[in-house]
């Protein structure tokens, strides 16, 4: 299991009185992020924080948008009429990415995250400048180990948000394929 998800610096939900595991939709997450932005948190060096970031080249911003996703293994769908559709050609895909634009526009998502290097991203997470991050939990932990953040500021340990539900409201789970799968080669 890769442990993809959204993570928040541990002192944030405590200061705001929010249980991060109660966040189940992207809309609830955005509300949580806005409250964190309004609070005015600082990093370990006393600098202003950015609300949310990703790792290199925007990896994995789509974790913030999980509640727009259907529970399935592929980007293709078979509609009621028997037509195959591709997610990136759907209205949902457009709406989902408009949320990303709104996050950047509202100052919730670091606009540099789409072109950043992994080292720069690790620095933002490692010194607690980013209040929220997403990708694999191990990557988040590694960034804080490199900086010593947890040793000097254990209250800033990143913790899980959610997990966010699928678009139909069902809980996010590890999706398993049915029947045969794999390569014939």
Where are the regions that the model predicts?
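Extracytoplasmic/secretory soluble proteins
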Residues: 1-185
